């Protein structure tokens, strides 16, 4: 059963306060770190509840879910955070405002072509692999050159996204992501999820991707096609 709108609002308010506390402790201003509501596996009502609670950014891993839930939303930024399949680039460009998961030139070229055909600018982040268990992402060494190649194709590269390790030292991995971000440039370091966001903010994250912390566990359901 989806959480009540009031419950989502209470969780968002508590998270916003705590995110700001950690942000202030790093010497940055209140509000410097954005919260992205990850709605994967949750119904459209959850998306609307997050927006009603004052969040501006929502994110999905799967294109099909976004098609079902993200149509005709109130003003917001829709982020694609799943793996980019080149044959779905046109549909991704149509459904999202930001693509956080560009990890190779092939994907970037497909998105740039689709954005050009649609006559629109597309913001993207370079996904960087900082975890030995993560399947996707450019290496830290490859990422700056990839960012320049993407910019040369007309994409608005606004920073870096990374997924922290499930074991090992997250602080070291987060520091590596920040180092890449400083070389790539932009305004967005999308780093940190429900289980590790505080450490990510301390490492310099400017956007945390929170799903369980806002909505609770995802309901059991059949696998959604990408």
Task: List each language-model region with its residue ranges.
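Conserved catalytic-core subdomain
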Residues: 202-203, 210, 215-226
């Amino acid at each position: 059963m989806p959480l009540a709108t009031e419950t989502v609002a209470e969780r968002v308010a508590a998270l916003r306060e705590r995110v700001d506390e950690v942000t202030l402790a790093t010497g940055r201003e209140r509000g410097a770190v954005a919260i992205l509501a990850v709605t994967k596996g949750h119904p459209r009502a959850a998306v609307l509840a997050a927006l009603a609670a004052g969040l501006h950014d929502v994110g999905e891993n799967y294109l099909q879910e976004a098609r079902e839930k993200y149509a005709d939303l109130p003003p917001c930024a829709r982020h694609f955070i799943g793996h980019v399949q080149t044959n779905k680039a046109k549909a991704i460009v149509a459904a999202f405002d930001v693509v956080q998961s560009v990890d190779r030139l092939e994907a970037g070229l497909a998105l740039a072509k689709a954005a050009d055909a649609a006559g629109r600018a597309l913001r993207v982040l370079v996904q960087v692999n900082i975890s030995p268990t993560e399947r996707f992402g450019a290496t830290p060494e490859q990422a700056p050159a990839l960012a320049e190649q993407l910019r040369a194709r007309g994409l608005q590269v606004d920073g870096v996204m990374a997924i922290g390790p499930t074991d090992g030292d997250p602080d070291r991995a987060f520091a590596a992501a920040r180092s890449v971000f400083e070389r790539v440039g932009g305004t967005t370091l999308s780093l940190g999820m429900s289980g590790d966001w505080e450490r990510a903010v301390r490492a310099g994250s400017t956007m945390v991707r929170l799903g369980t912390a806002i909505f609770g566990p995802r309901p059991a359901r059949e696998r959604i096609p990408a």
